[in-house]
Amino acid sequence: MKVLSVSSEVFPLIKTGGLADVSGALPIALKAFGVETKTLLPGYPAVMKVIRDPVVRLEFPDLLGERATVLEVDHEGLDLLVLDAPAYYDRPGGPYLDPLGKDYPDNWRRFAALSLAASEIGAGLLPGWRPDLVHTHDWQAALTSVYMRYYPTPELPSVLTIHNIAFQGQFGSEIFPGLRLPDHAFAIDGVEYYGTTGFLKGGLQTAHAITTVSPTYADEILTPEFGMGLEGVIATRIDDLHGIVNGIDTDVWNPATDPVVHTHYGPTTLKNREENRRSIAEFFHLDNDDAPIFCVISRLTWQKGMDIVANVADRIVAMGGKLVVLGSGEAALEGALLASASRNPGRIGVSIGYNEPMSHLMQAGCDAIIIPSRFEPCGLTQLYALRYGCVPIVARTGGLNDTVIDANHAALAAKVATGIQFSPVTETGMLQAIRRAMHFYADRKLWTQLQKQGMKSDVSWEKSAERYAALYSSLVSKGM
């Protein structure tokens, strides 16, 4: 089977979040199930800088008003189609934001162009290759199925994956003519959304199947609390909605071989984590004692529950724990966490910014990780933690709920528990979970059991890729 994947970011070329990890790992995992994937992504400067010996495969003299070229290149196991359109993508800043952190005002055109190019490739415009199905990711690629629906070309089966429904790609009605869609596409069953132009909304109306990145999140987005205004649209597509949890690259995330981990280990050699633990204490200037080290590796935002972490940091120390934080985000939260570190020298350490090697070492050396997200479509951090024997303490939401088995009495007795869940996401809820963790930590046999069971969890892409392959086959066989 041939699949065209369309994404605004793909790891390892360009990444701002989990979307890139999925769009970079899933095509490789799908190979085992006979799925040949070409991935279309924008030619940002970061992408153009690293690709080698690309081949020109297609030219668009007028892609929504600008010239564009499709380049094909193999990169670290990925078959990439790079949309080289300098007018859209060759600019400073990130994929979506300018150097001042503001949305590019023409983001609607930049990603409509990506979707239009994808629809043309889906229609067979790429010489010698035509996909059987198109798989699009988030609002930036969601118009692909809209173009395929309204353009006079054969319509292919399509899948739209929602990685985070909070990001919807909503723009004013005045941009609609620039999309070059027929007038009747600006309607309730098209892209019109309360008088605006909704990219994700249009994709939800026109894709043949919709997936989210965990089963719980698929249920949550049907509710007003999590649906972000689109729950009504999604409810009309409930029979086409599937929750498929993400996996991780278990070669990159492997404590037995990870090059940045100071001492390698596995489920039977957990004592080797001690050297990594000492490295963490040294980096964050912590006292060298046996108190449990809790860590946070996160964007410092309200959605991630970081205001709660900031508010309880002193109390974690008072309870006998230590805390280390790696991340960046809202200035007020950064300041609050730095202040807590100043008040608690040797017990709290904070590093503002993101450091990929340090994130690996923290998973390999800290005792537990706190993930108190108010909503979390899937989450990858807890999967890394399970893999590394860093016991996850998670809010009972989204993919966190699907991937961490709470250490309740029944799960402990059955020896299947892998972490600690808590709800509601409040200071009291989090502190109760941390208190439970410290109780378990005091019983080293029980704590080791939690670590080992977590490390045995299958967090690879294999099961997820198998489900995607089955979904693809179902749609293609139905001729959707």
Curated annotation (Swiss-Prot):
Q: Which InterPro entries match?
A: Glyco_trans_1 (IPR001296), GS/SS (IPR011835), Starch_synth_cat_dom (IPR013534)
List the GO molecular function terms: alpha-1,4-glucan glucosyltransferase (ADP-glucose donor) activity; alpha-1,4-glucan glucosyltransferase (UDP-glucose donor) activity
The top EC class is transferase
EC annotation? 2.4.1.21
Q: Which UniProt keywords apply?
A: Glycogen biosynthesis, Glycosyltransferase, Transferase
Task: Quote the Pfam families the UniProt record gives.
Answer: Glyco_transf_5 (PF08323), Glycos_transf_1 (PF00534)
Superkingdom, natural source: Bacteria
Q: Kindly tell me the pathway this chain contributes to.
A: Glycan biosynthesis; glycogen biosynthesis
Please write the reaction equations for the catalytic activity of this protein: [(1->4)-alpha-D-glucosyl](n) + ADP-alpha-D-glucose = [(1->4)-alpha-D-glucosyl](n+1) + ADP + H(+)
Any one cellular-component term (Gene Ontology): cytosol
* Single GO biological process annotation from the record: glycogen biosynthetic process
Which family is this sequence assigned to? Answer: Belongs to the glycosyltransferase 1 family. Bacterial/plant glycogen synthase subfamily.
Q: What does this protein do?
A: Synthesizes alpha-1,4-glucan chains using ADP-glucose.
Protein name, per record:
Glycogen synthase
Which organism's genome codes for this protein? Answer: Rhizobium etli (strain ATCC 51251 / DSM 11541 / JCM 21823 / NBRC 15573 / CFN 42)
